[in-house]
């Protein structure tokens, strides 16, 4: 958890300085770790190097600028710290498989047609659930993207109370992960979240008993936040049947998620399981409310 906070602090700083030069000394100062130690931590937590992360985020922002602004390609390239339009084009083409100019033309046509149909189609694999799902909306966003070409979002539409919540979620069989420790991670961004937003995961038995659960209730995301990295780590007991996961929004606001990753980890990675009530007692106790007074 200590390393997670250091990584989140550094990512938050990076997100605010993508249009500026970022040196190794900057990362050292923000993270408060030595260069090589923090780079190992970052690689382990996020799954890529600091340099790769910065390059990926600059490219994602540049791709959004190509679609949603009329700025010249050279201006976008220089704003995101590429040495030249040629250098930007080479790097962009490796990620998006076409040069920036062609991407701008193709994706604007593609997006305008797609947005019309997305309002009528469900998102593949994802379902909207919760206490008041009809007061929320989920969908695909091509402008607010962490990496690649799209992110998923969940936002309130008619929420009246902070206790009303919804989740954009999936479920799958636990068979493949029985007896293992599983780490779920995602990049999340929020806007105007009045109560809380969170990543969550639950492991259930065939009898629908909750075996493992974490909804980040002890570390909620609130307010307006930039893209950052969040993770949940749970064990999958041998009697597990179903794994559920998603992003949750309680009360008014909007939350985005992108680059969701599942991976097996060893026991050196701490579990984030929230302690559930223990085993049931054989009989009721302290019915007179006086047992504590007798000690």
UniProtKB/Swiss-Prot annotation:
Cellular component annotations (GO), alphabetically ordered: cytosol
Gene label: ybfP
Keywords: DNA-binding, Transcription, Transcription regulation
Name recorded for this polypeptide: Uncharacterized HTH-type transcriptional regulator YbfP
Role summary: Probable transcriptional regulator.
PROSITE patterns hit by this protein: HTH_ARAC_FAMILY_2 (PS01124)
One term of GO molecular function: sequence-specific DNA binding
Organism placement in taxonomy: Bacteria, Bacillati, Bacillota, Bacilli, Bacillales
SMART domains: HTH_ARAC
